[in-house]
UniProtKB/Swiss-Prot annotation:
SUPFAM superfamilies: Class II aaRS and biotin synthetases, Putative anticodon-binding domain of alanyl-tRNA synthetase (AlaRS), ThrRS/AlaRS common domain, Translation proteins
Residues that bind Zn(2+): H564, H568, C677, H681
Family annotation (InterPro entries): aa-tRNA-synth_II/BPL/LPL (IPR045864), Ala-tRNA-lgiase_IIc (IPR002318), Ala-tRNA-ligase_IIc_anticod-bd (IPR018162), Ala-tRNA-synth_IIc_core (IPR018165), Ala-tRNA-synth_IIc_N (IPR018164), Ala-tRNA_ligase (IPR050058), Ala_tRNA_ligase_euk/bac (IPR023033), DHHA1_dom (IPR003156)
Free-text comment about domains: Consists of three domains; the N-terminal catalytic domain, the editing domain and the C-terminal C-Ala domain. The editing domain removes incorrectly charged amino acids, while the C-Ala domain, along with tRNA(Ala), serves as a bridge to cooperatively bring together the editing and aminoacylation centers thus stimulating deacylation of misacylated tRNAs.
Job description of the protein: Catalyzes the attachment of alanine to tRNA(Ala) in a two-step reaction: alanine is first activated by ATP to form Ala-AMP and then transferred to the acceptor end of tRNA(Ala). Also edits incorrectly charged Ser-tRNA(Ala) and Gly-tRNA(Ala) via its editing domain.
Main location: cytoplasm
Protein name, per record: Alanine--tRNA ligase
Lineage: Bacteria, Pseudomonadati, Pseudomonadota, Alphaproteobacteria, Hyphomicrobiales
CDD domains attached to this UniProt entry: AlaRS_core
Protein family: Belongs to the class-II aminoacyl-tRNA synthetase family.
Source organism per UniProt: Rhodopseudomonas palustris (strain BisB5)
């Protein structure tokens, strides 16, 4: 049982034998929990079970949970690579009891696992208990036979767990392993407890109280158990290692990195190897769970992780993208336990490759900006920390690289102000993740769900029905009546109204009864499967137990059905045209339009869009029957039905199929497009009428979006487009067929005129004959200390044209310096300085342009010794800037 995979399996199988359901790891992006950026503990997916808001079909569970700690208060990112046990990604083994067994059984199960199944020597184990938890103290003594000296009472909050200011809470008991007296450190609670000798391997939380208010706790009627054991830590113990990075899983990854880079796993670059191994795991699992690199939220944290790893790849000498070439090694080690890693392997590789390619461009851009911002600084000066943070936060330019680049010039970074800026950013990020405060209002829905049960949905077969009012809600509270003019919500025993889910908007319509009319403006799901009808009472008073006639807006529902079925066809068509890596990231199905978001790393060409549209419309024209069937979820997936990753499905699922399975790109025997879907659909594909793709765009890095119309909306859009095209053709005095050629001709003519205008501006700026005339003994050429200087302020010239004029001037001067300053419409000044080859040993264009930039109010400048550019906010001082250059040459 020495390998990580064997240790994980042994844990799960042990608890399964002891009556626990093995529950798969939840995604790293928490479902329905806006308070967390990432899943960071095993209990996260059971949070609502512990609080009583959710019920599961089991009372005991065991998991191996994927966790990430790289944001918010749980942030291990900066420590990774420098300690033996910090990770951004880790696995947490756990067992849970929801009102079933409690302390005695939890302690017995834990002790038997580590001493009998895992075989740890009892004399190297000790435990802690909360100082007031006499019960746990006695149970450890009785069950484990531990002497009192090895049952340590801890009076601090380290051994008392709370979910928040209110909610379930209780004492903890931690199990520690003694690595031996050859390692510094004392037992928990001692002065030397921060040493590495005694390492916590398992934490048992005994949830036995309800925190009603600060200082006010009441006993829970059904105490529960939540435990967590870091897989990497227990693996290190079982493999006789004191360092998590020396376990078999990490060593396999480190060997793969070393083979690609030539680095010595035990040499000076050991830290970089560890960073890459850890960050490879975090980045790969986050991408597999649907997170993609971006500049905000979860995507921003992922980007930080990836770029930190890529920077360490550079330190190892990697000159080409490295991380994507390591994914295979991770899949080999962890793919069996986490099949989502196997499914997403190609996407992970492509995302890492593209991000590292972009990062190299970021490095180049960052160095240029750094040069400009630090140009006026001298040896011994300090670089502004706010600017360093802007480079880091806005441009992705790492602080350590900023420090390295400035160190050669004897310039340090103001770390204090950088840290202040970082703290401000973190505070802002924490505030954005502080949650929406909806938990209290959601309680009413969970309470109604417990009391009333699930709503029976009739809408697959009908748009009209009769129902009985079972509850009324107004302003987040259950009420006994809704009167005319009241805005509120109605819960019914059954309904044909579809509740918003899976990207499909909720139905609208009317509920009518004797003297009563309620206009439904939206239908939403609450507490899982409680259908709630939101709207306004137009007539009468609605009361519980009233019988109502329920009528969905037929025209709106028909349009929604067409758009939802069209998303399925477009999804499959995209896979056929672009490849099987296409995976849905989201959708919006409304009555008047649809959009579909999917994983793809580059823009879709117009030809590809046309092919996608044509393929989807071919299925529409075939007018095939759309079939639905109920299947066991495992059978449906095995049959090839596509599912939205991370979506929660029940044991039985609805499978929607359309198109002939015999088509070239058929999904399986059920049809051409086969997906798990709970939405409403057309009866035949011909009911869609027409699919018109209206746009394609980027949503985030690696995520594209297509938008489309169907049916009459598509027809109206096509008619409007045709009318616009005809009007444009008339203006151009040509036909529709000849219009593209006519436009191309006009564009060529425009480019020609723009070139002529640019040439004219250059000549005018240089006195009517261009740089040559001005340079050839013109009034603007003067002798400064034996050096010819052509210096002139010009109007209306862009920076790229300034460079061109300076190049011409250098050629005409033969030997000398040319400086041109242009004032823009907004009053800013731009300056370009050129030095002929024979003078670059005496004068650097970079030094000269920086002198001028200071006069214009700018800082720094950049370029090469023979050509440099800069700018400043005050273009009115153009002549003074040129005089500063002359003074520098003459000095």
């Amino acid at each position: 049982m020495s390998g990580v995979n064997e240790i994980r399996s042994a844990f799960l199988n042990y608890f399964a034998k002891n009556g626990h359901d093995i529950v798969p790891s939840s995604p790293l992006v928490p479902r329905n929990d806006p308070t967390l950026m990432f899943t960071n503990a095993g209990m996260v997916q059971f949070k609502n079970v512990f609080t009583g808001l959710e019920k599961r079909p089991y009372h005991r569970a065991t998991t191996s949970q994927k966790c990430v700690r790289a944001g918010g208060k749980h942030n291990d990112l900066d420590n990774v690579g420098y300690t033996a046990r910090h990770h951004t990604f880790f696995e947490m083994l756990g067992n849970f009891s929801f009102g079933d067994y409690f302390k005695d059984r939890a302690i017995e199960l834990a002790w038997n696992l580590i001493t009998k199944e895992y075989g740890l020597p009892k004399d190297r184990l000790l435990v802690t208990v909360y100082s007031e938890d006499d019960e746990a103290f006695g149970l450890w003594k009785k069950i484990a036979g531990l002497p009192e000296s090895k049952i340590i009472r801890i009076p601090t909050s380290d051994n008392f767990w709370q979910m928040g200011d209110t909610g379930p809470c209780g004492p903890c008991s931690e199990i520690f392993f003694d690595h031996g007296d050859h390692i510094f450190g004392g037992p928990p609670g001692s002065l030397e407890e921060d040493g590495d000798r005694f390492i916590e391997i398992w934490n048992l939380v005994f949830m036995q109280f309800e925190q009603v208010a600060p200082g006010n706790r009441t006993p829970l009627p059904k105490p529960s158990i939540d435990t967590g054991m870091g897989l990497e830590r227990i693996a290190a113990v079982l493999q006789g290692k004191h360092d998590n990075y020396e376990i078999d899983l990490f060593q396999a990854l480190i060997r793969a990195i070393a083979e690609l880079t030539g680095a010595d796993p035990q040499g000076e670059q050991k830290g970089s190897l560890r960073v890459i191994a850890d960050h490879l795991r975090a980045a790969s699992f986050l991408i597999a769970d649907g997170v993609l690199p971006s500049n905000e939220g979860r995507g921003y944290v992922l980007r930080r992780i990836m770029r930190r790893a890529m920077r360490h790849g550079q330190l190892l000498g990697a000159r080409e993208p490295l991380m994507w070439r390591l994914v295979w090694a991770l899949v080999r080690e962890m793919g069996q336990a986490y099949p989502e890693l196997v499914r997403a392997e190609a996407m992970i590789e492509e995302t890492l490759r593209l991000e590292e390619t972009r990062f190299r461009k970021t490095l180049e851009r960052g160095l240029t900006i750094l040069d400009e911002k630090s140009g006026s600084l001298k040896k011994g000066d300090m670089f502004d920390g706010d600017t360093a943070f802007t480079l880091y936060d806005t441009y992705g330019f790492p602080l350590d690289l900023t420090q390295d680049a400035l160190r050669n010039r004897g310039i340090s970074v103001d770390i204090a102000s950088f840290t202040d800026a970082m703290d401000r950013q973190r505070a802002k990020a924490r505030a954005s993740w502080a949650g929406s405060g909806e938990a209290a209002t959601e309680t009413v829905w969970f309470g109604l769900r417990d009391k009333l049960g699930a709503t029976e949905f009739l809408g697959y077969d009908t748009e009209t029905a009769e129902g009985v009012v079972t509850a009324l809600v107004k302003d987040g509270k259950e009420v006994e009546a809704l009167k005319a003019g009241d805005a509120g919500a109605i819960v019914l025993n059954q309904t044909p109204f579809y509740a918003e889910s899976g990207g499909q908007v909720g139905d609208t319509g009317v509920l009518t009864g004797e003297g009563v009319r309620f206009r439904v403006t939206d239908t939403l799901k609450k507490a899982g499967d409680l259908f709630v009808h939101f709207g306004t009472v137009e007539e009468g008073t609605v009361k519980p137990e009233a019988a109502l006639a329920l009528e969905v807006d037929h025209s709106r529902r028909s349009s929604i059905r067409a758009n939802h079925s069209a998303t399925h066809l477009l999804h499959e068509a995209l896979r056929q045209v672009l490849g099987d890596h296409i995976a849905q990231k989201g959708s919006m199905v409304a009555p008047d339009r649809l959009r579909f978001d999917f994983v793809h790393q580059k823009p879709i060409t117009q030809d590809e869009l046309r092919r996608v549209e044509d393929i989807a419309n071919d299925i529409v024209l075939e007018n095939d029957e759309v079939t639905t069937r109920l299947m066991a979820v495992d059978d449906a997936r095995e049959a090839g039905a596509r599912a939205l990753f991370g979506e929660k499905y029940g044991d039985e699922v609805r499978v929607v199929s359309m198109g002939k399975a015999s088509r070239e790109h058929g999904s399986n025997a059920f049809g051409w497009s086969v997906e798990l879907c709970g939405g409403t659909h057309v009866r035949r594909t011909g009911d869609i009428g027409l699919i018109s793709v209206t746009g394609e765009s980027a949503v985030a890095s690696g995520v594209r979006r297509i938008e489309a119309l169907t049916g009459r909306h598509a027809r109206q859009s096509a008619n409007a487009a045709m009318a616009t095209a005809k009007a444009a053709a008339a203006e151009l005095r040509t036909t529709l067929d000849d219009m593209p050629a006519r436009i191309a001709s006009l564009m060529d003519e425009r480019k020609k005129l723009e070139r002529e205008l640019s040439d004219a501006r250059k000549k005018l700026a240089m006195g009517g004959s261009g740089a040559a005339g001005a340079a050839d003994g013109g009034a603007d050429v003067r002798d400064v200390g034996g050096v010819k200087l052509l210096a002139r302020a010009v109007e209306g010239i862009e920076i790229k044209d300034l460079k061109s004029l300076v190049d011409q001037g250098k050629k005409q001067l033969g030997s000398g310096v040319i400086a041109l300053v242009a004032k823009s419409e907004d009053g800013k000044g731009s300056i370009v300085v050129g030095v002929t080859p024979d003078l670059v040993a005496r004068f650097s264009a970079v030094d000269l342009v920086r002198k001028a930039s200071e006069v214009l109010g700018g800082k720094g400048g950049g370029g090469k010794p023979d050509m440099a550019q800069a700018g400043g906010p005050d273009g009115s001082k153009a002549q003074a800037a040129l005089d500063a250059i002359a003074a520098a040459i003459g000095g």
